[in-house]
Amino acid sequence: MTNAPVTNARTDRFFNFPVTILIFASFMLGMSEFVVVGILPDIASGLKISEVTVGNLVALFAFVYAPCTPIGSALSARFPRFATYLILMGVFLVGNVLCALAPNYPVLLIARLLIASVSGTLVAISMTFAPDVTTDKYRTKFIAWVFSGFSIASVVGVPIGTWVANTFGWRVTFYLVSVLTTVLMISMALVLPRNSHPAKIGFLRQFRLFFDRRIQLGVLDVVCGAAASYVFYTYLSPIMRDEIGVPEQYLSIGLVIYGCACLWSNLYGGKLADKGRGVEPLTHIRPIYCVQAVCLCLLAFASLVPAAGALLLVALGMLMYLQNSASQVLYMDVAYQSHPGSVNLAASLNSMSFNIGIAIGSAVGGLVNDLLGLAWLGPVGAIFALFAAGITTLLRPYIQR
């Protein structure tokens, strides 16, 4: 394989151009994934279908995202990284253009599933650029900022996309995503490193990574942590409206405030992940899970003191993603140390695990809401948080002294 002129883009500055491009890539992936929630009524009206039918796009997106992420990442390890990354970005671009042009729901569904099939793999490949675009001291900061691209998409991208849809039509939102993606791809072609080391082991052998006890516990921890949050987060708007008493016209402001708390959570999670290597950073999250469990239990009483309930939601937003960088460090360090041919696959595990947790948390939350009501969502989520805390304890014997 021939190296292009750009082979290593590391500098002493963290926010160099390649790093900024990769953060912007995660922002675009997040905006494309989440914007459907904001423009759901517009799509339903435009295609003359029910909002429930459009809402199914969100669940089906996650359903395809979770299995395609590890499979796509393992396959991508067999090919030159730079070319694979640009090709998958091209698929992402085609999916968004197809969304904008979709004449009916089946075509829109196919387009969304096409986007879902490559999004997780793109995140995983982004993570593998870390050694080439930044120095080791910024490694966890890089991971945190790549994840934060999704939070920024929730806080900034989705409101912009919603405003564009309300003003010019929902198709223009997808055209906007497509134009920005085109600019992003041109920038990637100019500045991203082109050196890579394709895996020399077979496709199936990469999945031996899953037999590593540290990986198993790490995946289970992220699943439980995500489920703990999404039991209540799925019903965040109804909780704000019915339990805390936020007026309907101020719900969007409340969601932006919550999104800012989540952004802080991702960024501070990067600082927590700096405390050690391998499994160690994730073991430090145990007390955070315990605090999260307490906050979730207290959420049951939010309607009694609405102001305190609002502060509680902000606190839960600040706790929501603190494990992200620590778990990514675990996956990557274990892979580099014990499974060097499975690095791409390891880089995909956080996205895969979190989406499984989202699916479980959302399903459990729906069941609890139907049977017991909104007030019980927090206490049930606390059970998952305590499970996550227990799993971090099981990881302690694997800390390398």
Residue spans for each PLM region:
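Helix-breaking motifs and short loop linkers at transmembrane-helix boundaries and internal kinks
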Residues: 48, 80, 101-107, 118, ...
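Conserved MFS/SLC helix-loop-helix module at the cytosolic interface between two early adjacent transmembrane helices
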Residues: 67-106
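Helix-to-loop junctions at the C-terminal end of transmembrane segments
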Residues: 69-80, 266-279, 369
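Primarily marks hydrophobic transmembrane alpha-helices of the MFS/SLC 12-helix fold
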Residues: 85, 108, 282-285
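Paired small-residue
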Residues: 91, 95-98, 106-115, 307-315
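Helix-loop-helix hairpin linking two adjacent transmembrane segments in secondary transporters
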Residues: 105-107, 135-193, 235-242, 247
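Cytoplasmic helix-loop-helix junction between adjacent transmembrane helices
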Residues: 111-149
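A late C-terminal transmembrane helix in Major Facilitator Superfamily
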Residues: 334-372
